[in-house]
Amino acid sequence: MKIKICGLSTKEAVDTAVESGVTHLGFILSPSKRQVAPEKILQITNDVPKTVKKVGVFVDEPIDFVKKAIQVAQLDLVQLHGNEDMNYINQLDISVIKAIRPDQEFKEYEDVILLFDSPQAGSGQAFDWDSLVTSGLKNKFFIAGGLNPENVAAAIQHFPNAYGVDVSSGVETDGIKNLTKIKNFVQNASLASSKQLFIEFLRITKKLNENKIIPYLMGSLAVEQIINFPTNPDDIDIQLKTSDFENFEQLTSLMEKLGYQLIDLHEHKFEKASIHVGFASVETLKNYAGVDYLTIQQERMENGEKYHLPNVEQSLKIYEAAKRDEWRGGKQKDSFIFDELIKEQKRNDNE
């Protein structure tokens, strides 16, 4: 789940958002009480990891102004809140998020990330969620408008296929970003997203169990189950015994029955709406992290579904290896999770 905090204007708020685990930082570059200059954006984000995306928000600005701001602020995406059409968007050599009202026509915006917002963006007013039907929607989309730490979990539950959630005034007090609200919003969004992913993992596990396969849950979703700490997992990381990969066509057929499409044969990755599932061989853990899969003996049963889960010590070895892995992205997140695992290990040692 992507989590975006918008309307940022201070280094303190940016740092808090990044440390809390956001994926996107939003900055208003058009006239607004939250407006910030491109030069200041560059200044307050100079040490933000590349894995956290900087989004510039514009409303019907001249295209040259937007292009200049992208260059100066070193933006990763732009978010358009005006009447910009595809002719306008096609002039931008950058990923675009297009904000629209739930009752607005959006068929022309192919291959554009959508952001469903209230008619008055940044007002703190929510729109009627029931008025928006997203089943069958091919575009990735954010939900915005009136979100806050108290209702973001309900929003994620209501829109399980959402690409992300976006908040601005919902993490403010008297028009100023509230650092505690930012932390609470990110934590609540992360926990709600993880719950949705875990439910989906159990659906997949049920199918695997029916074929006499017991999967190994790995990655940040596994860590959240182990130490009960929000990690905002991006996907479902499943490992299987090599023998279970021998009939990959059967595995592909199984995933297709659950609504997934194979998007990367080499990496064994599947996709359904905003959910990504990756499969790998659990035997590779020994060379990668010094973890013999035969020692992963923690077996869990959830609603009758059976799966394996690494313990804290094994997870520490895996994330220590991930931190050294030059091919992996998300280094900051790996380090963050590693630090939390260290804390959990110390707590266990003191008990």
UniProtKB/Swiss-Prot annotation:
> What molecular functions are annotated in GO for this chain?
phosphoribosylanthranilate isomerase activity
Against CDD domains, the record matches this protein to: PRAI
GO BP terms: namely: L-tryptophan biosynthetic process
Enzyme Commission number(s) of this protein: 5.3.1.24
Metabolic or biological pathway, per its Swiss-Prot or TrEMBL entry = Amino-acid biosynthesis; L-tryptophan biosynthesis; L-tryptophan from chorismate: step 3/5
Which positions, given as ranges, span the membrane? none
From the UniProt record, list the reaction(s) this protein catalyses.
N-(5-phospho-beta-D-ribosyl)anthranilate = 1-(2-carboxyphenylamino)-1-deoxy-D-ribulose 5-phosphate
Q: Which domain of life is it from?
A: Bacteria
- Swiss-Prot/TrEMBL keywords: Amino-acid biosynthesis, Aromatic amino acid biosynthesis, Isomerase, Tryptophan biosynthesis
Which segments carry the region annotation N-(5'-phosphoribosyl)anthranilate isomerase? 1-198
Give the similarity note: In the N-terminal section; belongs to the TrpF family.
What PANTHER family does this protein map onto?
N-(5'-PHOSPHORIBOSYL)ANTHRANILATE ISOMERASE (PTHR42894:SF1)
Looking up NCBIfam families in the UniProt record yields: PRK01222.1-7 (NF002300)
**Name of protein:** N-(5'-phosphoribosyl)anthranilate isomerase
Query: Per the UniProt entry, what species is this protein from, by scientific name?
Result: Lactococcus lactis subsp. lactis (strain IL1403) (Streptococcus lactis)
The gene name reads: trpF
